[in-house]
């Protein structure tokens, strides 16, 4: 649950950008001046929108570890979930296929299908409602904050060039402006955020992001989640097939209260793997896993094996 709140707050998490073709003319990382951060952010925003079709074509496996801490900061409970992330009826969903290393029973799978159907219906309605108001949204209907608004809500500083995974990358630090006026709770999250972004210089896409929150913030007015200040996150993205950037790993740590009832204090670690592309509109192939025409995941015997912790 903490992961959902962290990803929502990160804004860019879960968004995947189109990758530019590899250039044959390699330029030394320090041989040219850094582009203006504002210009770079607008390019990232444009690339995200242009990559929408490619994002829909991909599915991947998601392994999630949730470690809950006791009052002394020691791990008291660990929950492991394996899912298949896919675009189903226009909505990006994570269909659970196993919990704690055990595949779902037929009864559990039926309940999961019901949950997915309700989630798709809810997200589709929210997307149509927000888009009818002229808002730009993701596939789940959440309103996207534009690059222009992010620049109004905070400041980017200390731009520099580094090499990340062998690729020239531009890094900049971000600090929200506590005096900035916000229009909704999502903007409040961005305003209260302090962190760092890594932008791939060739593709102009987000490659990594990390940050922490200076104040408490609420999702859905606190009805969905109430995240406490000091909560932090880090997300990394992977270039797949030289055409698209997909989620790689996400880590989050902090305190959150869910649905005004259950509290959670701990750490979450997510690893995405087994990236596959639709060959036809019916079946996802490539790699070892297959998804049936109705979207039901058919994991291989090793699909529920937790990936190694980085």
Give the residues covered by each predicted segment.
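Sec-dependent N-terminal signal peptides
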Residues: 1-17
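Structured extracytoplasmic
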Residues: 19-194, 201-208, 212-231, 236-249, ...
């Amino acid at each position: 649950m903490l992961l959902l709140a962290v990803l929502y707050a990160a804004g860019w998490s879960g968004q995947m950008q189109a990758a530019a073709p590899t250039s044959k003319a390699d330029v030394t990382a320090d041989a040219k001046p850094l582009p203006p951060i504002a210009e770079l952010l607008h390019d990232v925003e444009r690339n995200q929108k242009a990559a929408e079709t490619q994002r829909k074509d991909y599915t991947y496996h998601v392994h999630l570890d949730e470690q809950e801490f006791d009052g002394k900061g020691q791990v008291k409970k660990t929950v492991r979930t394996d899912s298949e992330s896919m675009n189903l009826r226009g909505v990006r969903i994570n269909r659970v296929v196993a919990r704690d290393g055990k595949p779902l029973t037929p009864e559990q799978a039926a309940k999961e299908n019901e949950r997915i159907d309700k989630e798709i219906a809810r997200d589709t309605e929210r997307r149509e409602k927000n888009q009818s108001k002229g808002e730009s949204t993701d596939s789940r209907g959440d309103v996207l904050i534009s690059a222009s608004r992010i620049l109004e809500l905070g400041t980017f500083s200390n731009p520099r060039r580094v090499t990340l995974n062998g690729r020239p990358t531009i890094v900049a630090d971000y600090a929200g402006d506590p005096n900035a006026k916000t229009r909704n709770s999502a903007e409040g999250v961005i305003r209260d955020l302090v962190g760092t972004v890594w932008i791939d210089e060739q593709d102009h896409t987000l490659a990594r992001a990390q940050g922490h929150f200076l104040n408490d913030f609420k999702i859905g007015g606190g009805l969905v989640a109430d995240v406490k200040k000091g909560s932090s996150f880090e997300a990394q993205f992977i270039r797949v097939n030289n055409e698209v950037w997909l989620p790689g790993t996400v880590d989050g740590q902090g305190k959150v209260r869910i649905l005004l009832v259950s509290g959670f204090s701990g750490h979450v670690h997510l690893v995405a793997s087994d990236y596959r592309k639709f060959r036809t509109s019916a079946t996802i192939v490539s790699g070892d896993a297959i998804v049936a025409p109705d979207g039901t995941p058919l994991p291989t015997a090793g699909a529920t094996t937790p990936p190694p912790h980085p």
